[in-house]
Amino acid sequence: MPNAVIVADVIRGFFEQGNPLYLGRAARRIIPNIQQLLEREVASGSKIFYCCDHHAHDDPEFEIFPPHCVAGTSEVEVIPELAGYPGKVIPKRHYSCFADTSLDKELVALQPEKLIVCGVCTDICILHTVSEACYYRNYEVEVPVDCVTTFDQTRHKFALEHMEKVLGAKLVSSPFEVKITPPQFDIPASFLSGEPADIYFIRTVEILRREGLNPVATMEVFPSRAGITCGMHEALTLLSKILPEDNREVWALSEGEPFQRKEVVLRITAPYQSYGAHETTYLGILSQCSGWATAARECINAAQGIPVISFGARHVHPLAVGRMDYAAIVGGCIGCSSIAGASLAGLEPIGTIPHALIIIMGSTARATLAFDRHMPPEVSRIALVDTFKDEPEESVIVAQAMEGRLQGVRLDTPSERGRVTADLVKETRAWLDLNGFREVKIFVSGGLDPERIRYFIESGAPVDTFAVGSYISDTKPIDFTADLHEVEGKPIAKRGRLPGITPNPRLKRVM
């Protein structure tokens, strides 16, 4: 059976600036997430219902809210960004998408497997719709948390908790689609010769060679905790160079896929001598890269649709920078500061103006203007504004000096001055807006982790992008273990493990 997707009030009146109940940046941020949701659901045969406010001129609701979304005005139109996703428009006058509309009749005819509810506002129309769907109509309901929002983050959080804990709706996060062309990883000769290996694997292969034993063996790899798969492309590149082409079978999860504790993520079947000495190497690749990607994903989830970039290059050894930043992008970061990481991900590096340039030039405005003169136009003009003056004042000074060319400001207030706070972000936004610089975005960095990111979100701070460093770069690797489960087709395992192949329908054959 198909699903039914209820898109509540994703219309111009709430999503476009200048209208009385425009939700601001919070609404704009969920548009790409809703687009991805609809793309997936349309491809799988689901039916889309756009439930849109259509109020009369004398609607009683206008005693509570200012007049909005009056029938016959452009405010009631579905936003242009969703024009490419076919669905039925259902006008509504009440909070619930079911109240005095044709939605109930449509769903009875469709008999959907489940309802997916997205849009605005989390604590008003979404909550009332989910309440009727779960409590009165007994539908299975999913609410993708990154596809709903409202005016107030405290009420947003309360409504989500109520839907899950009281009404029985399932809160889900949209699956990430890692849109990265698989990099061409260079496997060093030292890897192929076994230099990174634990010596006992080298000795094991040598003993088996001298004994004339080279059985076809199946090795399964699993993690110690849940996380995000990363390093698989590189591990598979290594395996493609060491396994015999005419006698190998490899199954794996894809880069960027989530995994659970003890879930098999990689299964290798080949003559043991071909890969036995390389266990340390492919486990190390998966462990470190999956740890970085998982830390990045934790930040992405906390950010609730606000972009996150990786700024952790300075915290790792130069030889590891590219892998770390690439893993952060696999985890969901929109980009990174290092050339090496961006190159692996097929992107351009992202950066701002550093303190060093500002201090040497003696002025943030002077440094920003010099940056603007000498950098190519495709490089973003983002000024660091905590060097010499208070951040709101410096932001306005630089924006005025740049005369419309400034794209963003970064707040990186040090701990000696209390770090960046939600109130500081709000003040900076207010002064920029007051001086006509509404399009200048605010980037926040400095000691960010999921908890700090949630603090900004729950405080309603108008952050446009988070830059995360050491939380990603310094994260603990995820331990991966490799165990033999078959030798020459016969199930076997060490004590404490189950012999034979461990089923996992999520694995795909890659060799």
Task: State what each model feature region is.
Residues 133, 262, 342, 409, ...:
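Conserved, mostly hydrophobic/aromatic
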Residues 6-8, 52, 145, 385, ...:
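Active-site flanking residues adjacent to catalytic metal/cofactor-binding acidic residues
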Residues 180-377, 405, 481-511:
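Ordered alpha/beta subdomains of enzyme catalytic regions
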Residues 35-42, 108, 134, 243, ...:
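Surface-exposed amphipathic alpha-helices with a cationic face
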Residues 1-4, 39-44, 67-180:
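Active-site-adjacent betaalpha module
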Residues 1-88:
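Active-site acidic carboxylates
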Residues 356-511:
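Glycine-rich phosphate/ribose-binding loops and adjacent secondary-structure elements
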Residues 94, 121, 147, 256, ...:
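Active-site-proximal loop/turn and secondary-structure-junction residues that shape catalytic pockets
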